[in-house]
Regions:
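Structural signature of outer-membrane beta-barrel domains
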Residues: 98-100, 130-132, 182-186, 225-231, ...
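Outer membrane beta-barrel transmembrane domains
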Residues: 136-138, 146-147, 235-236, 242-318
Length: 318
């Protein structure tokens, strides 16, 4: 019996070289959370601060599950894809620093991308391996956090994507379908870092290449889809959002510069309408690549983020 596309991809990926397997193993192990052994703290300070009394809804109901009231990696705007699949597998490790008054955050994340079926299908998994945060009392109180000193280490959610090439190199623009599941593996919901709840999004991305006589490639890009995630609102347990993005690539001599504006528009209007500008510069070598990105939050996600990525390029699965 034929395996589902997603499982088939992992089966094929298992035959990749040892370097790739070891990196993925490290990626998964780093996301495993160790059980807490510390003594249960006294929550009197939180109860007094927010006027909580016995019989009122539990503290989880006070956390606002939206990007404006969680950490920078809790409900991020999905990456703008380019309407087509890359031919080579990639393993990427990224160091990020998020600048925001009162909540400076640093993290290390990982990504694995595996194309197969002659470049018609690909799978991707990614997530924050470890995050360090240190926010001030004002941020703590605004987000109803129960982390009294606002300092700690958190582990991120894991994302699984399946991508299918619908059109490529035709008169019609390149078109890529992406469906992504977000797990609830993120930790420290009590510190308002992650939502401790699943979500998913699906989108179509489009692009068209235009090349000048000088060899400069210009590629406009667009994205349209939806994003849905679970909340703690007992009357509306799910928030749905319109996902959007547009931008362009400039490519020449293994260099690529990208600029875009992306975001999503939630229906609850409780800090669930993030919008951001994205700028990236990538340099490709034979078997590796370097990527530098800057993200500038405009609305409901006000971090300014720098990312530095190292990428290993491997042969595609067959």
């Amino acid at each position: 019996m034929a395996l589902p596309i997603f499982l088939k991809g992992f089966f094929i990926f298992g035959r990749q070289i040892d370097t790739m397997r070891n990196l993925i193993l490290f990626f998964f192990l780093a996301l495993i959370r160790l059980p807490a052994t510390a003594q249960e703290p006294d929550w009197g300070w939180w109860n007094n601060l927010h006027g909580w009394e016995s019989g009122m809804p539990g503290w989880r109901n006070w956390i606002i599950i939206s990007p404006a009231y969680l950490g920078p990696n809790a409900l991020p705007v999905p990456e703008l894809k380019r309407g087509f699949l890359l031919n080579k597998s990639e393993i990427e490790v990224t160091a990020s620093t998020h600048f925001y008054s009162g909540d400076p955050t640093q993290d290390i994340s990982g990504r694995a991308y595996i194309p197969f079926a002659e470049g018609k299908i690909a799978i991707e998994m990614y997530g924050v391996i470890i995050e360090h945060y240190n926010y001030i009392e004002e941020i703590r109180n605004e987000r109803f956090s129960r982390d009294e000193d606002g300092k700690g280490i958190a582990f991120g959610d894991l994302y699984f994507s399946t991508m299918i090439q619908l059109f490529k190199d035709r008169k019609f623009p390149n078109t890529l379908l992406r469906v992504t599941l977000r797990t609830a593996s993120g930790s420290n919901i009590e510190a308002a870092r992650y939502s401790d709840a699943p979500g998913y999004f699906a989108d179509l991305s489009f692009s068209k290449d235009f090349t000048s006589k000088e060899g400069l490639l210009f590629r406009p890009i667009g994205m349209l889809g939806f994003y849905s995630w679970q909340t703690n609102d007992e009357l509306n347990l799910q928030n749905d959002a319109l996902l959007y993005g547009m931008g362009a690539d400039l490519e020449k001599n293994a260099w690529r510069f990208t600029g875009s504006c992306t975001g999503y528009f939630g229906y609850k209007n409780n800090g669930d309408r993030p919008m951001q500008l994205n700028f990236g510069l990538r340099k490709d070598f034979k078997n590796t690549a370097l990527n530098v990105q800057y993200q500038h939050g405009l609305h409901d996600w006000l971090y300014k983020t720098l990312r530095f990525s190292f990428i290993w390029k491997l042969n595609p699965a067959h």
